[in-house]
Amino acid sequence: EICREIFNIIDYTTLINLTDIEPLQYSEYGVDDEYGWHRDVHDEPYYNGLVRKVSFSTILNTDFEGGEFDIETNNPTDKKRYQTFKTGKYNTIIFPAHMWHRVRPVKSGVRKSIVGWLLGRP
């Protein structure tokens, strides 16, 4: 349901042409787990001839430390060059799939999240 809601909001408020939703992915990060800098786009269409246009991540719990979500800002005047998000339970981060992002190492507990991708024609 959250997927469809995000799809509708982006479809109606932006010029991004969305046509489908990729299956959701459930993730758990334990102590010292992380996901390094990466982008969610592929070089060629791969899912029914579509590409990832929009990514989102929803945190499912708060009983963990660390595991912050960073997105590169592409701002050359910003020394840090990324923005850090430490979200609350069920908060969702939505961003263009071509942006570099990462999950920092979890220090304690287990970070649980659902991630998904909204798709469109290349």
Task: Place the predicted regions along the sequence by residue.
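Fe(II)/2-oxoglutarate oxygenase catalytic core
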Residues: E1-I94, H98-P122
